[in-house]
């Protein structure tokens, strides 16, 4: 058991005020990721808005939002069947009924102008990132993206098509990636691009709007 994160040993992890089942098929939720849910709550999006969590993993982001805003229609996608199995356990544990899981590569299933909000904590570490050695027990496909920013480009391109007018997108990103992700969002056509910091004061999330 040496080196195995305690959350995997106990099969439980805390996120916001909720507890989630986790195992090595999914990432362990991070405190900084809670900021995505908190910011989405701040958006005060309309009742019955359609939301997609891209690369849902354990489902902690989508399920937390589903419980805090039961009036929303929430979808959560992942390419990993293993991750979707874990997310299914968490949906059942929390008895969430305003959420649906979809096996999909990013937003490939989404129809044009069908979504009000896209949120994602995608893979954003480069394959040579020095932090990976400390994350050896976690699924590398959920951590690593070519060049570190390829996932942001692919999701942003697809999201711009899938979002309705005035729809929003929000990402968690690495602390040194703000300028790169800002440029990607701008190149994809997004406006009102705003960045935010985590509790340590590091650039950690960014959101934008389709206008």
Question: What does each model-identified segment do?
Answer:
Residues 7, 125, 176:
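Active-site beta-alpha loop architecture of Rossmann-like, nucleotide-cofactor-dependent enzymes
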Residues 147-209:
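Conserved Class I SAM-dependent methyltransferase catalytic core
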Residues 88-89, 130-133, 156, 182-184:
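Short amphipathic alpha-helical segments
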Residues 1-42:
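Conserved AdoMet
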Residues 122-151:
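Mobile active-site "lid"/loop adjacent to the S-adenosyl-L-methionine
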Residues 35-131:
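Conserved SAM/SAH cofactor-binding pocket of Class I
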Residues 19, 73, 98-100, 191-194:
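Conserved beta-strand segments of alpha/beta enzyme cores
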Residues 29, 57, 199-202:
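Short glycine/threonine-rich catalytic loop with a Thr-x-Gly-x-Asp
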């Amino acid at each position: 058991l040496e080196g195995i994160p305690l959350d995997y040993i106990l099969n439980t992890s805390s996120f916001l005020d909720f507890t989630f089942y986790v195992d090595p098929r999914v990432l362990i939720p991070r405190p900084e990721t809670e900021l995505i849910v908190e910011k989405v709550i701040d958006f005060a999006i309309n009742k019955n808005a359609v939301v997609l969590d891209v690369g849902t993993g354990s489902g902690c982001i989508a399920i937390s939002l589903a419980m805090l805003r039961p009036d929303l229609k929430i979808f959560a996608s992942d390419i990993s069947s293993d991750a979707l199995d874990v997310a299914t356990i968490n949906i059942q544990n929390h008895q969430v009924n305003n959420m649906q899981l979809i096996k999909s590569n990013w937003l490939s299933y989404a129809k044009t102008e069908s979504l009000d909000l896209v949120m994602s904590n995608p893979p954003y570490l480069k394959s040579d990132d020095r932090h990976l050695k400390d994350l050896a027990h976690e699924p590398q496909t959920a951590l690593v993206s070519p060049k570190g920013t390829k996932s942001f480009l692919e999701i942003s391109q697809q999201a711009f098509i899938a979002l309705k007018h005035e729809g929003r997108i929000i990402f968690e990103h690495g602390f040194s990636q703000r300028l790169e992700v800002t440029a990607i969002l701008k190149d994809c056509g997004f406006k009102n691009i705003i960045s935010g910091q985590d509790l340590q004061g590091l650039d950690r999330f960014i959101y934008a709007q389709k206008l």
